């Protein structure tokens, strides 16, 4: 079994390399994002960000961490001062509400658990956050640090 894994590893790496050469892509460069609980509703000062790299004109997708249908979800830019998009759950007969906000020099698609940045520029480098608020008004954050070259 181990031998089969080692034999197939170069093929997987070659596939990833060929995909990145012929299709715009970015590759996660370090650890996966971690969800941090915030006791004061603010982004924790000691939060650790997952590092991502991207190429100009490429795309990158960040995945939000766990959520439930009753959670309020937000994708944020910078230190959380700019909202990219928000999702509000179905509340007593209402439909789920989804808001997308215009951000200068940022082209994106947003879903409740993914943020895809499109046609990257170096101006898109920086920190992005996934914020989740549960029914008990407890806030959780995940951090993504993007470098575009």
From Swiss-Prot:
PTM text = N-glycosylated and possibly O-glycosylated.
Record has ATP-binding as a keyword: no
Renumbered to this chain, the signal peptide range is 1-18
Coiled-coil intervals? none
- Coarse class of the primary localization is virion
Q: How does it sit in the membrane?
A: Peripheral membrane protein
- Superkingdom assignment: Viruses
Q: Which residues are glycosylated?
A: 46, 51, 59, 67, 105, 109, 119, 136, 145
Q: Which GO terms describe its cellular component?
A: membrane; virion membrane
Q: Where in or outside the cell is it found?
A: Virion membrane
Keywords from UniProt, A to Z, are: Early protein, Glycoprotein, Membrane, Signal, Virion
Keyword DNA repair among record annotations: no
Similarity comment: family membership: Belongs to the RL11 family.
Q: What is this protein called?
A: Envelope glycoprotein UL4
This chain's source organism reads Human cytomegalovirus (strain Merlin) (HHV-5)
Source taxonomy: Viruses, Duplodnaviria, Heunggongvirae, Peploviricota, Herviviricetes
Gene for this chain: UL4
């Amino acid at each position: 079994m181990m031998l089969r894994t080692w034999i197939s590893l170069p093929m997987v790496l070659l596939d990833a390399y060929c995909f990145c050469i012929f299709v715009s892509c970015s590759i996660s460069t370090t650890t996966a994002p971690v969800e941090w609980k915030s006791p004061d509703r603010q982004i924790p000062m000691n939060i650790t960000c997952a590092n991502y790299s991207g190429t100009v004109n490429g795309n990158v997708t960040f995945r939000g961490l766990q959520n439930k249908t009753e959670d309020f979800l937000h994708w944020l830019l910078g230190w959380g001062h700019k909202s990219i998009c928000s999702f509000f759950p179905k509340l007593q007969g209402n439909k789920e509400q989804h808001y997308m906000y215009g951000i200068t020099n940022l082209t994106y698609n947003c879903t409740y658990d993914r943020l895809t940045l499109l046609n990257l520029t170096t101006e898109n480098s920086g920190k992005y956050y996934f914020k989740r608020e549960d029914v008990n008004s407890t806030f959780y954050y995940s951090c993504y640090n993007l470098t575009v070259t």
